[in-house]
Amino acid sequence: MADVKRVYTFGNKEAEGNGKMRELLGGKGANLAEMNLIGIPVPPGFTITTEVCSEYYAHGKDAVIQMLRPEVEKAMKNIEKLTGMKFGDKEMPLLVSVRSGARASMPGMMDTILNLGMNDQAVEAVAKRTGNPRFAWDSYRRFVQMYGDVVLGMKPESKEDHDPFEVIIEEQKHKRGVKNDTDLTTDDLKELVRNFKAAVKKQTGEDFPACPWDQLWGAVCAVFGSWMNDRAILYRKLNNIPAEWGTAVSVQAMVFGNMGENSATGVAFSRDAATGENLFNGEYLINAQGEDVVAGIRTPQQITIEGSKRWAVAQKVSEEERKAKFPSLEEVMPEVYKELDEIQHHLEQYFKDMQDIEFTIQDGKLWMLQCRNGKRTGAAMVKIAMDMLREGLIDEKTAVLRCEPAKLDELLHPVFDKKAIASAQVITKGLPASPGAATGPVVFFAEDAEKTLEKTGQRAILVRIETSPEDLKGMLDAAGCLLYTSDAADDRISV
């Protein structure tokens, strides 16, 4: 067992793995390696193989850590060499992200942790090095919140409960009289960190871990543990994904979209995932981190000018207001946008399929965090396959195989009668994230959607401020979902 390679490094346009190693590195790890090999800017890191996930369930946490320690320490030194920073250092601390990556895409089903390595010493060092204490403390509070949720189990226990960290944030915003997280000051964020840690101590009886290595092992094992959480099991069952596949874990040097107005994070699609139109599109948020976009907590701005104008028309926002308050990335950072557009085109041509990409802009520099074949509606599936056949990207056999029989059912979904819509009183409008029309009684909790179907045989309309992965069962039992803050980039909508 000692001779088995469990960790594969990547960075600086080199990688030990490649895109054909999905079974071992998972989809995310394989594509991170492949993007390095074709010259795409990717933060350095390493991937722990799917085989270790099986070992985790066979031998337990302590045995897996013991087996992994030498390879992980060596791989971390490689990141340190490429970044000039050191994991656990008090002067130049290296912060990392920890993400899951099964061989089949499971959007939103498993867990991610950002800014790992943060502690009371690291936050001061980051503040000093960047000259941006607000950014440092914002990154620290995000880390405590994510780690508390994913690793320490600080989650709502019932439908009446609220996320304990969000409650603390809302109380702080109310106290300060502000609406958005970005309006909180450095001192506010320091207070949030103190209150978060106090909440962790109260609920778990333990202090929040300060040692970066303890944090890392806790996060890695939590990702392996998330492979068997209820929502992941349900998703695998629905999509015929074997439990034996396991998940890989990718650890990467952090790049920061929350460093200020010249930083951003976003998700994009090389073609329209709803219609299949050959139109680059996506969303971004200035001064934010990746989870802010895919979690659907804040409504992002559009990447392209064309997309931004379409959004403004749908939202009845004037062109003047759009340009002033909701400009596209193409307008705000034209050079970065141009590079992003070139990369998405390169990736689609290389992988010969519509790409779903995640990116971060740190102080004006673009970094790619992920690419994968994008989820799409049934109508988009057919159009993309036929368009790519005509473009010579794929052959006829591939085009036919791209059309999943189960997805073709979407083309038969009910739609609203045009005459009825014309005469109806419209209460509100939003962005469609999936095809078809739906009717049913309104419920406000996922478990109520489950109970409605169970007791009455009728599917309800699930109305939420935003969804979380825990809502998956209720979403599947509902006729439709109406969300207040989510958008088409929300991972939960695409499942």
Residue spans for each PLM region:
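HINT superfamily self-processing domains
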Residues: K473-L476, S486
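Proteolytic maturation boundary segments
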Residues: P414-V415, K419-V443
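Long alpha-helical scaffolds
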Residues: G266, A449, A488-A489
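Nucleotide/phosphate-binding sheet-loop regions of phosphoryl- and nucleotidyl-transfer enzymes
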Residues: M1-A424, Q458-I461, E466-E470, D477-A479
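Single conserved hydrophobic/aromatic residue that forms the stacking wall/gate
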Residues: Y484-V495
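Extended, non-globular alpha-helical segments
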Residues: P432-E470
